[in-house]
């Protein structure tokens, strides 16, 4: 699945609360080359998987790879022409790289944490560390939150970097109000925007606004949404 970070964008970097939910309108899965609708796109995806595999092999070689992955099987599939067939738009913040990392862990992981079983906080923190390392290949640095949502397919409430857990969100109601996605038509890269935010955080005035104003209203939005209070 894809994901949507409803509340906490950038704020979670500064320990504001965050609420992220899976978004099943978009999804992705590994497919053999024979099932490709677009041969050129499949070839490009296959090449990207090969580059990612090389990165994972390098981490394994220096002993720093956190997840236990069957990289030999991954390599065999790549050599057979496998690609990641995804409807998730890239560069729109809905978890395209996160879904890929989750799919790799799900397909090639050994002794994985089963998302169908009861997931406790320790399991979530472990998964977050695994996915954070994997997705860092794409963004330079990753919290691991996006692939975590994609893998668990459950809403996650983030209190801090190490305090997070699954949560139940209110059932959809009836009326005129709704949360919706608006396609800006302007894809962008995550890392440059994070860099801009971190640069702004060096400013004392900006840090004060984030701490005293943004975090307060952001956390209030999360609490109200979970209670179903949308007025």
Task: State each model region's role.
Residues 1, 5-7, 11-13, 20-21, ...:
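C-terminal nucleotide
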Residues 15, 22, 100-102:
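Residue-level recognition of conserved structural "scaffold" positions that shape functional pockets
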Residues 87-99:
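Gly/Ser-rich catalytic serine loop of serine hydrolases
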Residues 99-111:
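Stable alpha-helical structural segments in soluble proteins, enriched in small hydrophobic residues
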């Amino acid at each position: 699945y894809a994901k949507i970070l409803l509340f906490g964008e950038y704020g979670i970097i500064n320990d504001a609360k965050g609420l992220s939910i899976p978004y099943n309108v978009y999804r992705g899965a590994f497919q053999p080359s024979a099932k490709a609708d677009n041969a050129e796109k499949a070839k490009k995806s296959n090449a990207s998987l090969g580059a990612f595999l090389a990165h994972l092999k390098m981490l394994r070689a220096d002993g720093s790879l956190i997840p236990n992955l069957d990289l030999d099987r991954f390599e065999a599939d790549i050599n057979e022409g496998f690609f990641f067939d995804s409807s998730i738009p890239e560069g729109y913040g809905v978890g395209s790289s996160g879904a890929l990392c989750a799919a790799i862990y799900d397909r090639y992981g050994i002794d994985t944490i089963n998302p169908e079983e009861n997931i406790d906080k320790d399991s979530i923190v472990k998964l977050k560390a695994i996915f954070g390392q994997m997705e860092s290949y794409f963004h330079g640095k990753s919290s691991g939150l996006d692939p975590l949502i994609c893998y668990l397919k459950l809403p996650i409430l983030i209190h801090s970097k190490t305090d997070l857990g699954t949560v139940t969100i209110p059932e959809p109601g009836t009326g005129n109000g709704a949360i919706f996605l608006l396609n800006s038509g302007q894809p962008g890269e995550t890392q440059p925007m994070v860099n801009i935010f971190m640069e702004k955080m060096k400013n004392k005035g900006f840090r004060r606004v984030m701490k005293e104003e943004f975090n307060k209203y952001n956390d209030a939005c999360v609490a109200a949404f979970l209670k179903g209070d949308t007025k």
